[in-house]
């Protein structure tokens, strides 16, 4: 075969980039990779329709996110929005789809059982047990519920560590970004809490993901709370509290959980 002329080779090299579709206005100054990452984020946490991810639906969902995080409603990506999207966070969506969390699911019994079914190698098992009990106590001191640990059988709330796909159609993504997720009260997976085993979990004595803070947040979901848009609340979707050692439930957390269960009287 005769050698292909260099001019033709150069034209063929330029064709893909020359005819590549430009990104929509909503992409702002972001590149294609960040545009696609933003689409995935909005699809997961704001229910951007995966079948109709056009510029208009993207703009609408981005405005919902901007409103949630108290940002100007531009409908356009920015480096700051990308920064928020890349923060470690809970895997539960920030807005409810259909009846998820919107019908105020709650436990009907005043005694809730829980079981720790698997552990992380980052912390001693007894430390995980202590932290889970402490996280539950932060909630129970505000509402007329008590929690009883069981070691065998099926509990109302089952807590464990897993990696990747783990049987609930919500696979973990490896180190960073999604740290954990939980399900609202109900049968089956209802109330269960899953932590990403690929994350590095700590008790606050070293750098890493503070397990007490994450457990308190996820157990809030187990009790029926959705995400709060109050940055001071434990139920805020991203994990960014500066002082993990002395954190406590914010007024927003307390008022929300007491709206579901009432105040503790003793």
Where do the language-model regions lie?
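Zinc-dependent metalloendopeptidases
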Residues: 2-266
């Amino acid at each position: 075969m005769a050698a292909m002329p260099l001019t033709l080779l150069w034209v063929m090299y330029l064709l893909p980039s020359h005819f590549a579709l430009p990104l929509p206005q909503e992409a702002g100054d972001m590149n294609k990779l960040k545009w696609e990452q933003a689409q995935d984020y909005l699809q997961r946490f704001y229910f951007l329709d995966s079948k109709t991810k056009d510029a208009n639906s993207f703009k609408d969902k981005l405005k919902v996110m901007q409103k949630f995080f108290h940002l100007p409603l531009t409908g356009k990506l920015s480096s700051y929005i990308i920064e928020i999207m890349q923060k470690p966070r809970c895997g539960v969506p920030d807005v409810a789809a259909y009846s998820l969390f919107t019908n105020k699911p709650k436990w009907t019994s005043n005694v809730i059982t829980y079981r720790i079914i698997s552990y992380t190698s980052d912390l001693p098992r007894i430390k995980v047990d202590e932290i889970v009990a402490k996280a539950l106590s932060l909630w129970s001191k505000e509402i007329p519920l008590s929690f009883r640990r069981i070691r065998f059988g099926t509990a109302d709330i089952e807590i464990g560590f897993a990696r990747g796909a783990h049987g609930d159609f919500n696979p973990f993504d490896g180190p960073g970004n999604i740290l954990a997720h939980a399900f609202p009260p109900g049968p089956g997976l209802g109330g269960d809490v899953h932590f990403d085993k690929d994350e590095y979990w700590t008790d606050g004595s070293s750098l890493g993901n503070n397990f007490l803070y994450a457990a308190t947040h996820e157990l809030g979901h187990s009790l029926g709370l959705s995400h709060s848009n109050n940055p001071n609340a434990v139920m805020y979707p991203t994990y960014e509290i500066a002082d993990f050692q002395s954190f406590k439930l914010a007024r927003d957390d307390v008022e929300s959980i007491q709206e579901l269960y009432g105040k503790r009287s003793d």
